[in-house]
Design a protein with these regions (language model features):
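N-terminal targeting/docking segments
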Residues: 21, 28-39, 50-56, 140, ...
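Hydrophobic h-region of N-terminal signal peptides that target proteins for export
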Residues: 67-75
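Compositionally biased, low-structure terminal segments
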Residues: 27, 32-36, 58, 246, ...
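Sec-dependent signal peptide recognition
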Residues: 60-67
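Short, low-complexity intrinsically disordered segments enriched in A/P/G/S/L with frequent Arg
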Residues: 5-9, 14, 19, 25-29, ...
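Noncatalytic, solvent-exposed loop/strand surfaces
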Residues: 75-506
Length: 506
């Protein structure tokens, strides 16, 4: 690698001959597109005089050639290590079923590999490493816990305060067999939850060496992949709820593992903080306060390497912010708008996309990875040097957007899908999924130029990627679906109200 200010070897177009490989198809690989996006961001930063580290074209060619060979062989995504999969992008390589039925009341089951019952109530999504699938659940001693889904504005907490058992499950991915289960914590909940939430909202994370279960006020638990407890960490009791109201809605931010570091965004009414722990032993590496930056948030942070630096990007209110991974130093901030931040920031094609849409403003931002300082758009021009573009009024409340082939797909909690040019912010089309009578909370995923959107009632809409709307199918899960799906080796894995369901062509 060349340091900033030195002479790189070459940065012109690569002269390598990749032969008969379909380069257009290879570029659609999320692995390749993320790599190319990071490279472009670094090159742009260098051209603008920003401190950065650039890869030489020879290094890039060698890396791309290796990735292209794997992609050309038809390799499918195997590991889905945390919320929304590799790099939190919600995009996978391979091919998955586009038509199925998991509802026995609607006829014969179709393209269902297995369906395993999971006791209790949770919105945590599956995390997958090789042939192991992990989920968490909260099992109430008072029996089935109440859950109210749909479109409503009631903010009162749920009546679900009896003793709970927080359980971590490991399933065999190919069969659905439960390999092991561990009770991480047992006791009365230390905080209340929203009527649409659960006491186990956070998706576990794994790096193949350890599994992290984050249970909010009930602590952090690290296991090896055989279920042996490695360490625990108590981060205190949180007060998660909207600012200015005597309400508690529970926590929902999921843990992120990156290079033996565990990153946790812990936002609440007072004393919000971002903390990085050693994934090996739970030792605190650094902590930075976020009071005044974010008074509450239910979003999962994203780790982004681009423009010569690695940063943690946190959705929040009143500010979205980026932090230096090594130290916790704030790099930039952006006045958000939506006062109940939920979506995760996403990095694709050299830009950071982030949205929040509860309350009055509903912004959608495309942030430059070399942003610095306060990059809030100027009120008169709606522009900022730190933004590539900015859409002030059509962001998403619950769902995290998906970026695929230079298009950004953003779905509202009422099922209104808006598709933008990811580079310019130009609106390509608007279309409603469903009849507008059900909520959409699960974040979508993209596989093989198709996108999958699940309603809270368990209806999954499959659309063709592109600048024009084309509905390919509508499929049934047979239960309430709030969690976001996982993808591994050409199969879909949905967490529903009472099951984990594996969907694959049969």
């Amino acid at each position: 690698m060349e340091q900033a200010g030195s002479q790189p070897e070459r940065y012109e177009r690569a002269s390598y001959d990749y032969g008969h490989y379909d380069v257009a198809r290879l570029h659609r690989s999320p692995i390749i597109s993320r790599f190319i996006g990071s490279w472009k961001a670094q090159a742009l930063a260098a051209r603008n005089g920003c401190p950065t580290v650039l890869y030489s074209i020879d290094v890039i060619n060698r890396t791309l050639l290796g990735v292209m060979l794997a992609a050309a062989a038809g390799a499918a995504t195997v590991n889905w290590p945390s919320f929304r999969g590799p790099e939190a992008g919600g995009v996978a390589d391979g091919k998955v079923a586009t038509s199925w039925n998991a509802d026995p009341g609607a006829g014969a089951l179709r393209n269902i590999r297995w369906k395993t019952a999971i006791p209790g109530l949770a919105h945590s999504s599956p995390a997958i490493w090789e042939n192991r699938l992990f989920v968490t659940s909260a099992i109430s001693s008072a029996g089935p816990a109440p859950l109210k889904v749909g479109l409503y504005g009631d903010g009162d907490p749920a009546d679900d305060n009896a003793e709970q058992s927080w359980v971590v499950y490991c399933l065999e991915k190919n069969t659905g067999k439960i390999l092991w289960q561990r009770v991480a914590h047992k006791g009365a909940p230390k905080t209340k939850r929203h009527t649409k939430a659960t006491h186990a909202n956070s998706t576990p994370a794994t790096d193949g060496k350890r599994l992290i279960a984050y249970l909010g006020s009930e602590g952090v638990y690290a296991y090896d992949l055989d279920g042996n407890l490695l360490w625990t960490k108590d981060l205190g009791v949180f007060d998660p709820g909207p600012q200015g109201y005597d309400l508690q809605w529970g926590t929902a931010s999921s843990p992120v593992l990156f290079e033996d570091k565990l990153i946790l965004q812990c936002d609440q009414k007072k004393n919000s903080f971002l903390v990085v722990l050693s994934a090996k032993d739970g030792k605190e590496l650094w902590r930075v306060g976020r009071d005044g930056v974010s008074n509450h948030s239910w979003a999962t942070p994203a780790v982004i390497t681009a423009a010569g630096r690695t940063q943690i990007v946190c959705n929040g209110w009143p500010y979205i912010a980026g932090y230096e991974l090594a130290t916790g130093k704030e790099l930039w901030r952006l006045k958000s708008g939506g006062d109940i931040p939920v979506p995760t920031p996403v990095f694709a094609d050299g830009l950071i996309y982030v949205t929040n849409a509860h309350g009055g403003p509903k912004p959608l931002y495309a942030v430059k990875p070399d942003a610095s300082g306060d990059i809030t758009p100027d009120a008169a021009s709606n522009t900022s040097p730190g933004l590539a573009w900015y859409e002030p009024s059509n962001g998403a409340y619950m769902q995290t957007p998906v970026i695929l082939d230079d298009l950004l797909y953003s779905c509202s909690d009422r099922g209104v899908l808006k598709v933008y040019d990811a580079r310019t912010g130009q609106l390509r089309y608007t279309e409603r999924l469903g009849a507008g009578t059900t909520g959409f909370s699960s974040s979508p995923i993209a596989v093989d130029s198709k996108l999958y959107f699940a309603s809270e009632e368990g209806e999954v809409y499959v659309i063709k990627a592109g600048a024009q709307f084309e509905l390919l199918s509508k499929n049934l899960l047979g239960e309430i679906a709030m969690a976001s799906p996982a993808v591994s080796e050409n199969a879909l894995y949905y967490r529903t109200r009472g099951h984990v369901v594996a969907i694959a062509e049969r």
